[in-house]
Amino acid sequence: MKKLIFSTPLILLIILTISNCEKSNNNHLKDYVYTKDPAFRYEIVQIDTAKSWKEYRIKMISGTWLTKNEVNNTEWWHWITIVVPNKTLETEALLIVGGGSSKKKEPLNASELLINIALETNSIVAEISNIPFQPLNFSNDSKDDRYEDDLIAYGWKKFLEGGAKDKDVEWLARLPMTRAVVRGMDVIQKVGDNINIKINEFVIAGASKRGWTTWTTAVVDDRVIAIVPIVIDLLNVVPSFDHHWRCYGEWSPAIDDYVNEGITDWMGSKEYNRLLQIVEPYSFIDQLSIPKFLINGTGDEFFVTDSWQFYWNKLIGENFLQYVPNGNHGLTGSYNPGSLIAFYNAIITNRNIPEFNWYVSNDSIYLDVDSNADYTIKSWQAINENTRDFRVDVIGKSWKSDEIYKTVNDKYYLHVSKPTSGYKAGLLEITIDSGTNYPFVFTTGTLISPNSYPFMPFEPLTPKGKRIK
């Protein structure tokens, strides 16, 4: 899908000012990743042979994070599982960025999905675990065993409270998370070399925090030729989270880890802006012209369902979007990964994805499709009769679909009319034959009507940091 044009006004609340006491440096991420760490090493702990593939299980130490005076375990280790089809034809590989816990001591076994993708595409497919390495216990911290956002938010707090200085940048866990994925690609290439299979390039996919890390990995490593960030619908954090507050009038419980560490009190400060400048993918989007397939849920607990509006028209290159109707943050019970497989296969085989373009104007979505494409169209809509909130745990799985008959001119639109009370959300979904066992499934962005907010902008009760006027 080519560059999209949007006629609806976007909320522009981008903070550009940085601290006067420090010069901006957007290279912290790359500098950190490519600083050699003598702790890096790996070993192949198990090789299994099946009828149509081999499975390599590897333990990798990606490096160290912080010091023993700051955290109980400085060395990050990860399981890497690599599926190598007997009939490997491609020099590209798919790397899925996974989570997990260091308490799991056994090697990570390849999932049925991993094996299926490898055999379907005749390519190497791998997964890396423990992104981030967790749980961790920090010195002088009253809380034990921090995981996931709890771990990341604690590091954010330390960085912000220290004045967002260069010397404290290592507190940002996104740096070692990104380094781990880059080192994982190194290891996969080395394993490939040992079995005489050249791996030149990678497609990276990951969900939630791993979706954010998918973006940052592409920022620092040219081996990444396409990305699939999943359920990380927050690019351009500042206006996106102002939007979040104005829709809900509160912070969603899903981001309690950040609220509990006081991170939201830093919003609107030079220190907070500095943090985003270092680790937020939106800071680097002008460097990312590679194909991107963004997969989100319409009912995500973390992000408002029309958050695409704050970044989509700024993305460069070929970009594709899928809002999974009735999908929560885990896409539980709603998501079929077939479109991801089709996208990955198209990338590694240089197959063109049929062109379509969409845009939003006032209260309607417009979609134009290449007349040569073999496709079907659906509309999806949902109503909240009370407020502007489409999270699954608020409205349930209430999105309903309607088939749309194919038109003579391959042009479509969806009018999202204002309901009698509350708000209505809608989107268009297009399913396109990919020439494989799995079709492409893409959507437009979600449109909500009426275009109004039930709440005022967020103002911290106890603002922290140097405020931006």
Describe the residue ranges of each PLM region:
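N-terminal cap/lid segment of alpha/beta-hydrolase-fold proteins
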Residues: 33-88, 115, 128, 168-175
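Short beta-strand element of the alpha/beta-hydrolase
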Residues: 79-81, 90-100
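Cap/lid segment of the alpha/beta-hydrolase catalytic domain
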Residues: 101-102, 123-182, 234-250, 254
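Short amphipathic alpha-helix adjacent to the substrate-entry channel of hydrolases
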Residues: 107-127
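Gly/Ser-rich "nucleophile elbow"/oxyanion-hole loop immediately N-terminal to the catalytic nucleophile
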Residues: 163-208, 224
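Hydrolase active-site cap/lid region
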Residues: 216-265, 322-325, 331-338
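Serine-hydrolase catalytic core
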Residues: 271-327, 362, 368-377
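Surface beta-strand/loop "capping" patches
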Residues: 342-381, 397-416
